[in-house]
């Protein structure tokens, strides 16, 4: 089949946010908050308007627009007023450092404006690296795609990955993973689930392909350029440069590309602006405009970023719940089953809603994200799992109650038939030991039956009290894991 002819385009600005989800070690929520404060991170809050220009390079992000975009229920989750409130707690740190991504054929300069760490319930977290290509001369679109494709790789797997190096502050790092965890987030990996990189905290979420970061991008082409469908497809698939340094696209069928865009692209403002959403990328490509580009950047860093993080949070939690359900041994893991029931209910009550966005503007983009992440399907499966667990728990409890009722009924009936009052009278006041020694076999049986009934009642009472205490402790632990992500319960 004939190769598609690629017409190289020049970019004016290229903004990237690389997002990496990770699993926190259990019980480290308080210590990671202290670590971040000591490392120069600051809790992000909407009422701190001075931060509107602090983390985004030349652009300003309106806190008022972010708050207005979401419903009040969602705002409480995304923008908690303090570390003690439930929700997603974002800690930001301005950097404004420059570096170079070096390949066998290219050297691509970039600037990192800031980094975020967001701690979440369910022992989750997100790293965000806010990056921009700021060339001194015009840079081809293929270079920005190659940069994103290589920078997102945290754990090299291929020859292409191993040939990538990053130069920053006079040091050369072997790939993005070493740069991220030995420079940008130095010392953070000790809070990750997994004791070492060999053990690897990267294995926590297997649905993220090859340990790569999610890419959110905004690319503005120069004013005299035009966007075609091949450019949009290359943005979504990160088709940058071949090993020879030439632009490429891994599709030769133009109707296939058009069909792909029908499924994954949002073309309301075409042909000047396209949005495209995939499982690994959320991208916008537009033509540079003095008015449009700042508005898109405001959304890119603001409501679109939080929409992405919220949907990633929903997806990961639902996948974790589904994974826990598949590994559950309901005959043995009774406590794990109760914890799973609580976790699903807590997620529904505290963090999930079908209506999240308050404004019709760009609402379609948010729900396109949900559709591509299969949020509704995952949530439906979680509810089905919950119903199945409830039915099983009801059956087990019904059997236990029936058995207990049978035992108590037998004691009551047999005791009345034997006339326990005859032996009980000998224990009122001073115990009549002579009478006890003179009992016949039937009276001894009645005595043993009465004594065992008292003992069983005491055991059941003590066991119930002990179980109540354990349940309260477990509940506090579950609340801390699923409702709060900070220091206090």
For each feature predicted by the language model, list its residue ranges.
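N-terminal extramembrane/targeting module of integral membrane proteins
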Residues: 197-319, 323-326
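N-terminal pre-transmembrane cytosolic regions of membrane proteins
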Residues: 1-221, 476-489
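Intrinsic-disorder/low-complexity, polar/charged segments
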Residues: 135-147, 316-319, 323, 330-336, ...
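Hydrophobic alpha-helical transmembrane segments and their immediately adjacent juxtamembrane loops
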Residues: 5-12, 16-18, 381-489
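Membrane-associated alpha-helical segments
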Residues: 300-301, 306-429, 433
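Extended hydrophobic/Leu-rich segments
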Residues: 249-253, 257-261, 344-350, 359, ...
């Amino acid at each position: 089949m004939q190769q598609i002819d690629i017409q190289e385009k020049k970019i004016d600005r290229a903004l990237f946010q690389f997002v990496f989800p990770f699993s926190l070690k259990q019980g480290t929520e308080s210590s990671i908050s202290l670590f971040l404060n000591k490392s120069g991170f600051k809790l992000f809050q909407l009422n701190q308007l001075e931060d509107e220009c602090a983390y985004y390079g030349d652009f300003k992000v309106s806190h008022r627009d972010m708050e207005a975009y979401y419903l009040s229920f969602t705002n409480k989750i995304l923008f908690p007023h303090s570390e003690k409130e439930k929700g997603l707690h974002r800690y930001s740190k301005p950097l404004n450092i420059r570096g170079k991504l070096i390949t066998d054929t290219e050297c691509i300069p970039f600037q990192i404006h800031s980094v975020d760490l967001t701690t979440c319930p369910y022992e989750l977290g997100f790293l965000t690296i806010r990056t921009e290509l700021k060339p001194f001369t015009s840079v081809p679109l293929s270079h920005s795609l190659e940069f994103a494709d290589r920078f997102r790789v945290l754990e090299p797997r291929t020859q292409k990955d191993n040939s990538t190096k990053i130069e920053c502050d006079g040091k050369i790092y072997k790939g993005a993973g070493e740069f991220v965890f030995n420079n940008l987030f130095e010392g953070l990996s000790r809070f990750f689930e997994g004791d070492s990189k060999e053990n690897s905290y990267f294995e926590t979420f297997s649905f993220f392909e090859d340990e790569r970061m999610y890419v959110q991008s905004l690319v503005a082409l120069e004013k005299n350029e035009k966007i075609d469908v091949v450019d949009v497809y290359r943005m979504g698939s990160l088709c940058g440069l071949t090993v020879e340094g030439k632009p490429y696209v891994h599709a030769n069928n133009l109707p296939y590309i058009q069909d792909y865009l029908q499924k994954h692209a949002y073309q309301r403002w075409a042909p000047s602006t396209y949005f495209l959403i995939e499982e690994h990328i959320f991208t916008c490509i537009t033509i540079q405009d003095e008015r449009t580009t700042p508005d898109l950047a405001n959304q890119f860093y603001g409501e679109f970023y939080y929409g992405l993080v919220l949907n990633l949070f929903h997806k990961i939690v639902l996948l974790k719940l589904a994974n826990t359900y598949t590994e559950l041994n309901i005959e043995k893991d009774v406590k794990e089953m109760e914890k799973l029931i609580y976790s699903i209910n807590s997620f529904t009550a505290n963090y999930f809603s079908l209506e999240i966005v308050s404004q019709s503007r760009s609402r379609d983009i948010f729900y396109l994200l949900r559709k591509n992440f299969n949020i509704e399907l995952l949530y439906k499966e979680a509810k089905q799992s919950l119903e199945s667990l409830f039915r099983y728990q009801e059956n087990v409890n019904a059997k236990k109650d029936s058995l207990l009722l049978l035992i108590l009924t037998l004691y009551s009936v047999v005791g009345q038939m034997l006339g326990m009052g005859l032996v009980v009278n000998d224990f009122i006041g001073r115990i009549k030991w002579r009478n006890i020694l003179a009992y016949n076999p039937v009276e001894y049986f009645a005595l043993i039956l009465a004594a065992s009934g008292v003992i069983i009642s005491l055991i059941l009472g003590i066991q119930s009290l002990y179980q109540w205490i354990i349940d309260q402790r477990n509940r506090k632990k579950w609340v801390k894991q699923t409702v709060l992500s900070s220091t206090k319960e």
